[in-house]
Amino acid sequence: MARKHTFPSLKRAEILECIDGLGIPFTAKELDQPTSKAVIPLYEEFLDLFMGLTRQNLEEKVNSLQDSVENFEIIHESLRFTVFYQILSQFMQNICFHDFTIQDLLKPDRNRLQLILSAVINFAKLREERLQQFDDDIQKRESLLETYTLLDAQRKDLEEKVLLSQDRKLESEAIIKQNEERNEEMFQSLIEDKRLCSQVRTEYDRIRMEASELKIRYHNVDSLMASTLEEIEKLQSSIVHSPEKLKGKIADTSLRIQNDRSQQVELDKKSKILHTKLNSLQLIEGDLNACLKVLEECLVELDKLEHATVLLSTNQELCDQIEINKKKLEFRKEQLLKQLSNAQEKLEHEQHSRNQKLEAAKQRMDNIREEYKVITQERNKKIQETEKKNAMIEMTEQKIAGMREELESQISSITMEFEKLKSHVELYIAELLRNLRSSNS
């Protein structure tokens, strides 16, 4: 027994026109002589158009079964066909075509294909008519998705900045630690150099004092030698003729000369020592200048250290601010996700309510069709009776006239009843649409 469907069957020309309007390539020959190779791509286009399931999405669903299925490469095509059939069957159930079978894919029949395409086209028309009722929800959903995408991109950007700041912070801390260690070493070296400088200055002052004393003594010796030479010249003028006295004076003079010579040798030695110490002092003075230059470099490094410390503090504040912004963005993201979830739940609830009301309306239409069928059968019976009475018109003309009037009155009452039922149905559908609009708003 053929299953009854709630949608009207469309004509061949109308089906081809609607499919062409959807932008799907499908010829009249493929509709009249359908094959599996022709209908499977057509159904794939329907899934892509109405469910957003592309061939790539289908491959991803099949590939997700790779870990749970043995010999995946061998049965890949069979798995793909099975998954495709399951999704397509679910789609057919949703558009009220409940007797879709695998034969419709493998060995499609012309009449069933025409019926299936009628179901899809009627669903597309109904979807297009009802789509305006959900425009606000769709726009809100798209707006929320765009906001979520933007916030997610900002969150990733901030995370990258935080990671970069943390890396810079670690590098700055390592550089600061190295600078602190180097500054500590240089500070200790400066303290030692300062101590050595003070010792060298003390030694230098002592040597200068000794040099000045030696210069004074040297001048004294020179003056003494000059006076001695003068005395010798005086003595030469007054030569002593007594040998004993002469020998005594000679001995005294020799002794004085030897003493002067020894003093001169000592003075020469001290002068050489002083020259050596002066050279050492000059070298020490060069070392002191180098130490002063190192000290200036240390001061520059200390300034750099202070600048790096200020920069580190600024980066730390920036990192803290970024963390605060990150937490705010995460909180905002959770709020948006909750709003999106609530909107989706509301949309699903509205769709479920709409489906229930549509099912009720379809059931009512089925009942009306059954009643109309019964009325039509009764009308056919009356017509048959009328034909029999027309055959006997010569015998019972008056009786036939009366029955004809009675039949016409019954037909008019039936027509009026049908019109009433039709007006009730239209009123019910209008009330249903108004309730749907009020529930959506």
Swiss-Prot record:
Member of which family?
Answer: Belongs to the NUF2 family.
Cystine bridges: which residues? Answer: none
Species: Schizosaccharomyces pombe (strain 972 / ATCC 24843)
The Phosphoserine modification is found at S143, S242
Q: Which GO terms describe its molecular function?
A: kinetochore adaptor activity; protein-containing complex binding
Regions that span the bilayer = none
Q: Coiled coil where?
A: 51-80, 128-186, 316-426
Q: Name one Pfam family in it.
A: Nuf2_DHR10-like
- Under what name is this protein listed? Kinetochore protein nuf2
The GO annotation for biological process reads: attachment of mitotic spindle microtubules to kinetochore; attachment of spindle microtubules to kinetochore; cell division; chromosome segregation; initial meiotic spindle pole body separation; initial mitotic spindle pole body separation; kinetochore organization; meiotic centromere clustering
